[in-house]
Amino acid sequence: MPPKKNPLGLNALQLKTLTLFQALAALEDHASPAADEPGAVVVTDLPRPHGDHFHLGRGVVASRDATGLANPAVWTALARKGLIRTTGPVGTVVVTAAGLAYQTGMGDLLHQADH
């Protein structure tokens, strides 16, 4: 039997936010390995939108798809499911190995851009 889609029952905003955390975790400018948790990544320096979008590496994300980055309830829900941990200063998150591996099905949030 194929794996269940969204086995933790995340809502759309939680899925979008986790997708963005996963993308940030892949960028050297925003992430580093977590010293205390094998397979986890510390994400810092969350991007700030300008206008209706923000840049994520070579990609662009619509601001409307990133509201969860500033929503404490979303962070709490993702932490409760074991996908992230909040730590240190505001705007710092540890994406757990489970969070990095979770299939959100929302990779289309990231659009390639030339500017």
Question: Where in the sequence are the language-model features?
Answer:
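Short, amphipathic alpha-helical interface elements at domain boundaries
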Residues: 2-67
